[in-house]
Swiss-Prot record:
Protein name: Uridylate kinase
EC number: 2.7.4.22
Major localization class: cytoplasm
Reaction equations catalysed: UMP + ATP = UDP + ADP
Alphabetized UniProt keyword annotations: ATP-binding, Cytoplasm, Kinase, Nucleotide-binding, Pyrimidine biosynthesis, Transferase
A single GO molecular function term of this UniProt record: ATP binding
């Protein structure tokens, strides 16, 4: 258990997870139960701090629509398949959360009432006020939009203070830190600089939406245990993208 501050610096947060994050170190499996359980344990600490939390997860561990389109698949069909992959991941997270006592609801942008509620903004807000964790599935429900853009939309709709983007590296760098040992990490950077330098934080649509609505983005390393709680507690890690 990680305890930093009694009062978190953010009251409502949208956490964006990649689908690949659920794979953990087991690249032979789409979903690693140990990794999902580790994420759930950190989420419980966040809930115990009194933070209101929404989650958007990608589907790239199961299916990547952009890659399928590049190989000849119709883009609309490929994107819908990717959206369905996010539903699978959302249900995996819900199961892990509820197993350790986190009251959770999944809302889907594509109607599938047998397994998830439809996305209704007022209902999502009501769940959050009752201290339920919200998992938003199926992206925006429309092709040609990424799950990063979906995360920004949901963050604005639930009036989140910040969108926390979980990654495999410590923050935003001037170039790929995996390929270049001299890559420099930014502590703070503006939306406009991210767009001008074509830094791979989120797609341009998502970054522009954040800029237009003054929604800060905190980019951090999910692979370091305790980092979700550190971010919410105001510990200076990662990169903050803002005005």
């Amino acid at each position: 258990m990680v305890n930093f501050l009694e009062k978190p610096v953010y009251k409502r947060v949208l956490l964006k997870l990649s689908g690949e994050a659920l794979m953990g170190g087991h690249r032979s499996s789409s979903i690693d139960p140990e990794m999902v359980n580790a994420i759930a344990a950190e989420i419980k600490e966040v809930v115990n701090l009194g933070v209101s939390l929404g989650v958007v997860v990608g589907g790239g561990n199961i299916f990547r629509g952009v890659e399928a389109n590049a190989k000849g698949m119709d883009r609309t069909s490929a994107d819908y398949m990717g959206m369905l992959a996010t539903v699978i991941n959302s249900l995996a997270l819900q199961s892990a959360f509820e197993r350790i006592g986190i009251d959770t609801r999944v809302q889907s942008a594509i109607a599938m009432r047998e397994i998830a509620e439809p996305f209704i903004q007022r209902k999502a807000m009501s769940h959050l006020e009752k201290r339920r964790v919200m998992i938003f599935a199926a992206g925006t429900g429309n092709p040609y939009f990424t799950t990063d853009t979906a995360a920004v939309l949901r963050a604005m709709e639930i009036k989140a203070d910040v969108i926390m983007k979980a990654t495999k590296v410590d923050g935003v760098y001037d170039k790929d830190p995996v390929a270049y040992s001299d890559a420099v990490m930014y502590k703070n950077i503006t939306y406009s600089d991210v767009l001008a330098q074509n830094l791979k934080v989120m797609d341009a649509t998502a970054i522009s939406l954040c800029r237009d609505n003054h929604l800060p983005i905190l980019v951090f390393n999910l692979q370091k245990p305790g980092n979700i709680v550190r971010c919410i507690s105001g510990i200076p890690i990662g990169t903050l993208v803002g005005d």
